[in-house]
Design a protein with these regions (language model features):
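Hydrophobic/aromatic-rich transmembrane helices and adjacent perimembrane loops
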Residues: 311-338
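Membrane-interface alpha helices of multi-pass inner-membrane proteins
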Residues: 163-169, 176-203, 217-220
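Multi-pass, polyprenyl lipid-linked donor-dependent membrane glycosyltransferases
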Residues: 111-115, 135-165, 170, 185-194, ...
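Short hydrophobic/aromatic helix or loop-helix immediately within or flanking a transmembrane segment
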Residues: 57-101, 322
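Membrane-lumen/periplasm interface segments of specific transmembrane helices
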Residues: 21-36, 192-302
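Signature aromatic-anchored transmembrane alpha helix within multi-pass, membrane-resident enzymes
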Residues: 215-223, 336-364
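Transmembrane-helix signature of polytopic, membrane-embedded enzymes
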Residues: 103-107, 120-143, 161
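Start-transfer (signal-anchor) and selected internal transmembrane alpha helices
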Residues: 1-44, 339-342
Length: 367
């Protein structure tokens, strides 16, 4: 695997820039919405009060209910076993808040803020150690999926900070910490298992059987937790969680001239489709190199995302975070032109939708 460069430049400037940028984003969002941290939560009457036909809010509210109420939150979850499967973020928020309902929404923001900065730091350090400009790590901090997830108290910042740091640790032969982080990440978001799968595919091609077994075992904590939830949670899924589909099949049934859906198709869907053949060719040409596998698996996830994700570019951007991380980890062996294209793929939706992200206001229930 790629070796570190001892004469690397400091990775701290882009990390500091990320912290300052997200601090400004947070302050502006709070100032626009009455200084209430519940702006990040996006509570909707349908799930907070059980009002049929009420506003649905957004996914961060389910983290909030779980962190605040524990098992008592199950009636307020659209898909109880699925939402409770992403237990790491609400559990961390509940612990940080000390059980205080007043402090809980602030704790959620603080954890995601720290996660964004930590994920950026891990990627910037990886790049700097390999003589790549660490400022490229801002493509992660500024990618639409991370910015939007941060603004809605979703689980992606925690999940992808863990999986980025875990993948880097594994590639740097720090197997113990890498294994632990890769095992924790699916407890924040299940799709992060694709990173362990990509690493395992490369290890399998190299016949590193011990690594294959270890990487497969990273899925066990999340699998055991999900099995427990499936057996223990009686509440049915309400409204449903979309199933994965054939590539691009989620986009076409809902295709129209809505700006959010057009942006999902042209800014994320078609670029992902263009990336897939090259990534697959990389796995064929160099099957023992993890980068091709990581990119191919995460790009494929974007393409097979369900209809709900294609409904708006910001929803699909959350699915695409894994592809951005995988591509950034491959920057040391990518051309300057490809690096620029990846950065554009990551941040273009953010540049277009940053204003609406800040301006949109939910119904902020206090229950």
């Amino acid at each position: 695997m790629l070796q570190a460069n001892t004469s690397r430049r400091s990775h701290w400037p882009p990390v500091i820039a990320t912290a300052l940028g997200y601090a400004c984003f947070s302050l502006l969002g709070l100032a626009l919405h009455g200084w209430s941290p519940l702006w990040f939560v996006w509570i909707g009457e349908r799930w907070s009060e059980g009002v049929i036909g009420g506003r649905t809010g957004y996914d961060g509210q389910f983290v909030y209910y779980l962190a605040r109420d524990g098992w008592a939150a199950l009636p307020h979850l659209d898909a109880p076993a699925y939402r409770a499967g992403r237990v790491l973020y609400p559990l961390s928020a509940a612990a940080l808040s000390g059980g205080s309902a007043d402090w809980l929404p602030w704790s959620m923001v603080a954890i995601n803020f720290a996660a964004v900065v930590a994920g950026t730091a891990a990627i910037a350090r990886w790049l700097a150690a390999r003589a790549v400009n660490p400022w490229w790590a801002l493509a992660y901090a500024g990618c639409a999926g991370i910015v939007f997830a941060y603004s809605r108290d979703c689980t992606e910042p925690v999940a992808y900070a863990l999986v980025a740091a875990g993948t880097i640790a594994w590639l740097d032969d720090r197997r113990g910490i890498g294994w632990a982080l890769l095992a924790l990440a699916p407890l924040a978001r299940e799709s992060t298992v694709l990173f362990a799968a990509g690493l395992a595919a490369a290890a399998l091609a190299a016949r590193r059987w011990r690594d294959v077994r270890a990487l497969a075992a990273t899925a066990l904590p999340a699998m055991l937790w999900q099995a427990y939830l499936t057996a223990s949670v009686p509440a049915p899924t309400i409204g449903g969680i979309g199933l994965l589909q054939f590539p691009m099949a989620g986009a076409f049934p809902i295709a129209d001239l809505d700006p959010g859906r057009l942006a999902a198709l042209f800014l994320l869907g078609l670029p992902a489709l263009a990336l897939l053949p090259g990534a697959l060719a990389w796995t064929w040409r160099e099957p023992r190199v993890a980068f091709g596998w990581l990119i191919a698996l995460n790009v494929l996830l974007v393409l097979i995302a369900p209809n709900q994700s294609w409904w708006h570019v910001l929803g699909l951007a959350r699915v695409a975070v894994g592809a951005v991380v995988a591509l950034l980890l491959a920057f040391p062996v990518l051309s300057p032109e490809l690096r620029a294209a990846v950065a554009a793929f990551a941040v273009a939706p953010t540049l277009i939708w940053l204003g609406p992200m800040l301006w949109w206001a939910p119904w902020t229930a206090v229950r």
